[in-house]
Amino acid sequence: MTDTDLLAGLVPERFDRHTIIFLFRPADATPYSDEELDRLQVEHLTYLRGLKDEGVLIANGPLDDQTDIRMRGISIYALPLTDALELANDDPMVHAGRFEIRGAQWLTAEGTIRFDAPGDSA
C-alpha cells in the first residue's frame, strides 16, 4: 500500500469552510475609563447581536485559559474571509483600538461540525 493509498482514507473528500476571526488585545490598546469600557462592551455586543440576527455571524465568544493572553475571543462567520474581515473591522471595539483582528478559513471534514441557526434548539 502506498502513501497515496493511505492518505485517501485519512483525508476527507469534501470540506466545509468556516471563517474564523480572532480578536486580540493590542499591546498598545487605547486606555479608557471603566465607564467608557462598559459602554464600548455594550456597543460591541450589540453589534455582534445584529450580525447574528442578519445570519452572517454563526457563533462568537470570549476565550479563557489561552496560551496568549492577548487573545480575547473568536467569531465564526458564514461569509468569505474578506467579507468577514470587513465586518469585524467595523466592530466598535476595533474602532476604539481595544481589539485588533486576524482571520482564517478553517476547513473541516464535511458535516462534522454543525452550528444551529439562531432560535434553533438541539
Q: What are the language-model segments listed below?
A:
Residues 1-122:
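Conserved, structured core segments of small domains
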